[in-house]
Each structure stands twice: as C-alpha cells, then as structure tokens.
Swiss-Prot record:
UniProt keyword annotations, A-Z: Coiled coil, Cytoplasm, Cytoskeleton
Signal peptide: none
Compositionally biased intervals (Low complexity): 46-59, 572-581
GO cellular component, as recorded: centriole; cytoplasm
Compartments, record wording: Cytoplasm, Cytoskeleton, Microtubule organizing center, Centrosome, Centriole
Broad class of the protein's primary localization: cytoplasm
Chain intervals for the UniProt region annotation (Disordered): 46-72, 564-590
Keyword DNA-binding: no
Coiled coil start-end: 546-580
Disulfide cross-links: none
Protein name: Proteome of basal body protein 15
C-alpha cells in the first residue's frame, strides 16, 4: 500500500535521536478535566522555554548523554545539535524568546501521558492543527480519546508525520480504528484514507466464502461451549461428525474442503480478524464515522454486522461473535436486536441477549470505575490530580437506555415451551426481577390471564425484589461454567437453546421474507435441538459433607430456639394484656403504648422461616423449569408446601368443591400437612425443586400462608364483607389460586436414591421416603430423614458421623428422569 507521507522525506531518525528538537510533543488524555494541572505538574512540564538556535552551531554544547524521554520526567531536550539537517536549519524562535522573554504560558490542561522531543518545521507542515498550536504555544498537543490508543499515537501517528512508511499488513483492526480516530482529530486526511482503505481490504479479504450464514452455523456446531458436560464434539444433529452440511445456495460457488475448514477455524478462534474488524469499525465515534473516508466504511461494516448476526442463535455460540455483540455501542446493539431480518426460533433468545448486553455493560462500567478510582488514588499519592469522568468513560445504562434496549423484544411473540407469555416460565421469572421492565413485560397481555390480573392489581409495577430471596442464582452461576458470579447473566444467556423451538421468526411478510432469512434458517425441516448441553443431562446428583450438615443443624437449632423464646414472650405479654383488660385497668398489666404496639395474633410456627437450604450446583431443564437438588434442614411444619402442593393449599373449611386435579392422595397429604402445622421436629429434606426465582412474598403466597399486597387488593376477593376488608380465608384461597400457576402441581422422578458412605449408630441416616411422604403422592421426589431433633442435635451422633478420614462422610443423593 502506497501512502503519501505527511512530510516529503523520511525524518524519522530525528524523532528517534532528538536532533534539532525545538519543541515538544505532549500526549494528553482528552477525557481528563481541564483543571487537572496543579503546581506539581511542573515535574512533567518543565517551565524552561525553548532556546533559539545559536548563530554559531559549532560552539554549541554537546548532547546530553541521558536516554530519550519516554516517561514524562523533565530533561533538557531543546538544545540544538551541531549537525546540518537535510540542508535546512530549524526555524529561529520569536523575537520575544530570543530577547530572553518567556514563551507564552501553556493553557491549563490535563497531565501529560508522554512527552517526546519534536520539530516545528515537520509538525507545522504535517497538519494545520499543529501549525495553529505552535503559533501560540511551545508544545504540540496530541489529545487521546482513549488511553489505550497511546501506543498507536506514539509509534504510528508520529511515524506518518515524520515520513516513515508504515507496515500496514502487520496492523490489527483495533489499531487501524485508533488511527482513524487520531487522524480525524489531528487533521491528517492521508492517514485517515489509508487506514480506512486497509480496513475495507480486511473486510473484503476475510469475509467467509459464500456468505457468513453457513460458516457461522458450522463454526457454532464445532464450538464446545462451557455448558457442555461432559465435553464432547458436535453431534450429527448439530452438523458435526457423521452429518455433512448442506450445500451453500446456488448463487455462490461451493468452497473447497480446505477453504471451508479454514473459514470455520477462523471463526472459532478466540480473536477473529474479520469479526474484530467489524466490531472496530462499528465502534467508531459518531463524528468520525460520519465524515471523511469513514462514511462508506461505516456503512459497509453495519451491513456486514447484520449479515454475520442474522442467524442469531448460531452466532451466539461463536465466542468471537458473542464477544463482539456484547461490546457493541448501544445504537449498534439496538439496530441488531430490532432488525426485522433477525431470524430466531423464539423471542426468548432476543430477551436473554438483551439481558446479557446490560449485564456486560454494567460489569465493564464497574471495572472501569474501579480502575479510575485506583488511578485517582495513585495520582493523589503522587501529588498529581485525579482522573476525571470524561465522555469516554463507560457507564451503566440509564432508565431510558434500558427501555430502548428491552423495547427491541417483541414480548407479544414470546413463546416458551409451547406457551405464550406465561408466568410459569424461567425467562419470565428471571426478567421480572428488574422492576423497570414490568410495563414492557405486560405489553399486549392485558387480557392474558394472570399477567393482566397482576398488572391490574399492581398498576403495572411488580413486587420489589428481595436480594436474599433467590439463593438459586449462586447455584445457577456455578453451574454455568468457569465464569465469575457477576457474569451469571452472560452464562444464563447461553442457555437459550434449552427453550422449545417454535420456529417463530421475527421477519414478517410471508414468502417475501424468506429471502431475508439466513441460509441455515431456510433449510427444510425444523432446526435440530443442540445436544450435549446441561439441560439434556439424564440425572442430578449432590454430595453434602456431614461437617456442612452439622453446621447447618446448629444454625437452624439456634433460630428455632430464638423463635420459641420470642413466641413465649409474646404469648405472656398477650395474656397480661387480656388480664389487664378484664380487670378493668388494674395493676400488673402492660402499658397502653406497649399494648398498642403488640401484634394482634401470634404468628403460626409454619409461617416463620428458620430452615436452611443447601442447593446443588447442577441444573436440568424440563417442561419450562430449571430443576435442582436441595438438602434442606428445618422443622417439619415448614415443608407443608412440598408435601401438600399448591393445588391443595385452599382450606377445606371454605365448603367449596375440591379442584378436579386433587387426587385422594393429594387431599390426604393436605390434611396431614394441616395436622403438622405445629410439628417442630427437626427433619432433613432431600429432594428436587424447580428453580423459579421467586420472591419471599410469592413463595409464601404459593404455600397458602399469605397473600402479597398487590395480589389481593382492596377491591379484590371478599371486598364486600366486613367493612370492605378482605376475608382471610378467601384471600388465602385467591393467593393460592394465583400462585398455582407459578409452581408445578405434581413432580415425579423415575429414580431417587439417597445413601451414606457407611452405617451410623442409629441406622442409616436416610430412612425415607417415609409413609408420610408416600401419602403425598410424590412417588420418591423427596425424602424425610426419620431422625428427629434428638438425633440431629446430638453431639455423640455427629462425633461418630464425622469420625471418618478428615470428616469426609457425605450424604449422597441422585435423581433421574425429572417430570
């Protein structure tokens, strides 16, 4: 590539040696505040003015033996050298400087990142911006929008200014994009055109043969995501070994086998040059992309981005494409998600991609803020100024940007597991944790059963999420691969393949829209479901060491004792209050203020959460739910919901007919649960439960123990009773009916095993499933240890249990075939 240099000759040796330097080139951060310079900045910016070239160069002082300035520490770099430079001499300084008058003071600005010697004649001839700067001050300032572009500015921008040819094939797309921004900011049109031409050449040369559709799908089939357990190659259904990919469209010639392998390998690389070039151009600032040589380049990159991400589900499995999408600017991400040509099997993929984008943006903003705070602390410790929050600093999405992002999802087309926008789906329960999305989620569902009822009762605003109510998120993050917990949404977004494929394409227009779909989406027949992922696991298993169980039992026992003390105190105070009322205000009662502050009734034992759950790290997806194993310790009365089920939560005293799906075994389990409301025997529950991401209020309502304020309002059921107050029985029944959609009515597993590593003094710890659990009709979905508080709280029992090598005895459970 032949590029006209800014200077007609190669003057780069002068830049390396500092010969005839008569000015300085200062690199600064454009995002730093203007008042970032204080008195200590004199260490970076020497106050000495540039000296004029002497009349007799032969009598000049010898050059300084010190190294070239590269860290901003001041040294005298302005003394001319006794050499003749290409038949020219440096321009003499102004008369004021020659007469001993100081040069014009530098304007207050950010601290320099780097200071190098410069030459006025070269800089002034290269750019009108440098010419204007050197006419009023002693330094040529290069402002960087991003500090990461400092190497490109120091090595490439100055090399072009001084006439050194650049090695264009060796430059990465990110470096070329940085050169585009630097050349646009410093009025170097030749460098800008050369960088734009190189990026266009990369996009044309690296584009997959025959279009990115087949190549992206083939690369996605060959990528082993972190969720594949155990790691395995692509199955025949995924287009792997044993199944040949269909031929590309007739319009494009079929590439050779070797070329196809190269394309797939390039897309599977961690850093793809083609994807990096697209992302670098799309990420250009608006003022740079909309002017000069970047106009056509930016338009081409946007078209290629939509082309590569058109088959969105296949592109999401390619690491380079997924990383490129998560790093896009918000306008580009909105253009991708809102594109009418985006082909997905269900709208849940788009919703989870939006969640992943917001999570990534928030995480990177937090990391950037932490880095800025660290730099500010280092600057304060060194006497310098702080780091400012300029326009280039990444920040989380505000409310308007979040609404724009999630507005790209067509919620009325949301299909999950064959159902349209129901509450008992994993995606709906996950997304509803964001309060600002409630109005968007209820769009188009005013008459869709539970969604419309809750929207009418709560005014479109959901219940406030409880931070400690969803401990399953930690297990979900741990099950999603070797990622940090803060990136759990990124990992959960990769699980979109578990949703049922309904072939609900976003493109509209019947047969005319088929031409806009990617080739892999236009194949005959439904898209095969991926295999090898976590949701296709045939079993769940969980190991809990006895040491962990012992600690959990101690914590639960302490909570139960504390709750019992509070309960006795409250009962005694209420008895005193009643005696005081009957005695006509005699002595011995409680004060009126204390009596008014006391609750009207003692809370039932089953309504107080004292249990502790140990959740397994593995998940299995089936029938719209994520299933997980859990070992829970607590009083028996706290497991009424698991024993009776939400369908039998309505009290039998209401006189209404039983629900049609209530079997005799379920009714018997409900009666047994009511009889055990005061049973505080400590038990160990081992079983399977759905991961619903519910709040505490929702779980309590599903258990029939309470109704959230938004679910049974003033005008709700039973409102025309005593003074407009809702009847308690009717409110509980209404809450249980609403919550019945959130929980499965009955759960079955094909195999359920719980065992120990050895026998214990009182027999095997796992003696269930007990007859009480059998009566619930759950057929092996749970086990209640037949060891009451006398055994679980016995020190001798645990001393024998943990007496193995390093206390490694465990309770092991395994289930298979969850229904």
């Amino acid at each position: 590539m032949v590029v006209l240099s800014a200077f007609p000759v190669n003057a780069s040796p002068l830049l390396d040696t500092g010969d005839f330097a008569d000015c300085r080139i200062v690199f600064v951060d454009a995002n730093a505040p203007a008042d970032d310079v204080n008195a200590s900045s004199a260490l970076q910016l020497p106050a000495s003015s540039p000296a004029k070239a002497p009349a007799n160069p032969g009598r000049s002082a010898p050059p300084s033996p010190g190294p070239r300035l590269a860290t901003g520490v001041a040294r005298n770099i302005l003394s001319p050298k006794p050499k003749i430079w290409l038949g020219q001499f440096p321009q003499p300084a102004t008369s004021r400087t020659g007469a001993g008058v100081e040069a014009p003071s530098r304007p207050a600005g950010p601290q320099p990142l780097l200071v190098v010697p410069g030459h006025r004649v070269v800089l002034a001839a290269a750019s009108p911006l440098f010419r204007q700067q050197l006419a009023t001050q002693a330094d040529a300032i290069i402002r960087l929008r991003d500090r990461t572009s400092l190497p490109a500015a120091q090595q490439l921008l100055l090399a072009h200014v001084y006439g050194r040819p650049l090695d264009w094939p060796a430059l990465t797309p990110t470096t070329l994009a940085q050169l585009l921004v630097l050349s646009a900011d410093h009025a170097l049109p030749a460098l800008q055109q050369a960088a734009a031409a190189r990026l266009l050449h990369l996009l044309a040369a690296k584009r997959p043969v025959g279009g990115p559709g087949p190549a992206v799908a083939a690369a996605a089939a060959g990528v082993n995501t972190p969720l594949q357990r155990p790691p395995c190659g692509p199955s025949p259904l995924e287009g792997g070994a044993g199944t040949a990919l269909p031929a590309p469209p007739p319009a494009a010639a079929a590439p050779p086998a070797g070329a196809a392998a190269v394309v797939c390998t390039a897309l599977q690389e961690v850093h793809s040059v083609y994807v990096e070039a697209i992302a670098a151009v799309v990420g250009l600032p608006t003022d740079v992309a909309g002017a000069g040589a970047c106009v056509g380049l930016a338009a081409a990159a946007r078209v290629l981005l939509l082309d590569a991400l058109q088959d969105f589900e296949a592109a999401w499995q390619v690491p380079s494409l997924r990383r490129a999408f998560l790093g896009l600017p918000l306008p580009a991400a909105l253009e991708v998600l809102a594109s009418p040509a985006l082909a997905v099997s269900c709208e849940g993929v788009v919703a989870l991609a939006a969640l992943a984008y917001e999570a990534t943006r928030t995480q990177r903003a937090v990391e950037a803020a932490a880095a800025a705070a660290g730099e500010a602390g280092a600057a304060d410790g060194g006497g310098g100024g702080g780091v400012g929050d300029g326009g280039g600093v990444l920040r989380p999405l505000d409310t308007c940007e979040q609404l724009a992002l999630y507005g790209c999802v067509r919620w009325h087309l949301l299909h999950i597991d064959g159902r349209t926008h129901e509450w008992n789906s994993f995606l709906k329960n996950a997304v509803q944790r964001a309060p600002h999305l409630q109005r968007l989620l209820e769009h188009g569902t005013a008459a869709s059963g539970t969604g419309g009822a809750v929207a009418a009762a709560t005014g479109g605003v959901g219940l406030a999420p409880h931070a400690a109510a969803v401990p399953e998120l930690a297990a979900a993050a741990a099950a999603c691969g070797p990622y940090a917990a803060a990136a759990s949404l990124l990992d959960l977004s990769q699980l979109t393949q578990s949703l049922l494929y309904t072939r609900q394409m976003r493109a509209e227009g019947g047969t005319g829209a088929a031409a806009h779909l990617p080739y892999m989406a236009r194949r005959a027949g439904p898209r095969p479901r991926p295999t090898g992922h976590l949701q296709t696991a045939v079993h769940l298993q969980m190991d809990v060491p006895y040491v962990v169980l012992r600690e959990a039992v101690a914590r639960v026992q302490a909570r139960m004792e504390q709750q019992e003390r509070q309960r006795r105190l409250l009962e005694r105070q209420q008895q005193q209050q009643q005696q005081h009322t009957k005695g006509g205000g005699g002595g011995g009662g409680v004060p009126a203020a204390t009596a008014a502050a006391l609750p009207l009734a003692v809370a039932p034992v089953a309504a107080v959460a004292v249990e502790e759950d140990l959740v397994g790290s593995e998940l299995v997806f089936h029938a719209g739910y994520w299933w997980q194993m859990v070992v829970s310790l607590g009083p028996l009365c706290r497991y009424r919901m698991a024993l009776a089920g939400p369908s039998a939560a309505a009290p039998p005293a209401s006189g209404s007919a039983a629900v049609a799906r209530n079997t005799p075994s379920a009714l018997a389990a409900a009666a047994a649960a009511v009889a055990h409301d005061t049973d505080t025997r400590l038990v160990c529950f081992v079983g399977v439960r759905p991961l619903l991401l519910l709040t505490e209020a929702e779980v309590e309502a599903a258990a029939g123990r309470g109704v959230p304020s938004g679910w049974a309002g003033e005008g709700g059921c039973g409102g025309e009773g005593e003074g407009g107050e809702a009847d308690g029985v009717a409110a509980v029944a209404a809450g249980a009916a609403v919550a019945a959609r959130l929980l499965p009515s009955t759960v079955y597993v094909e195999q359920f095993e719980v065992w120990n590593e050895r026998d214990l003094p009182q027999g095997r710890a796992a003696l269930g499933p007990t007859a009480f659990a059998r009566a619930g009709g759950f057929k092996g979905t749970l086990t209640l240890f037949a060891l009451g508080a006398a055994a679980l709280t016995s020190e001798a029992y645990w001393a024998k249990a943990v007496s193995g090598p390093e206390g490694a005895l465990r309770v092991r459970a395994r289930v298979a075939g969850v229904h």
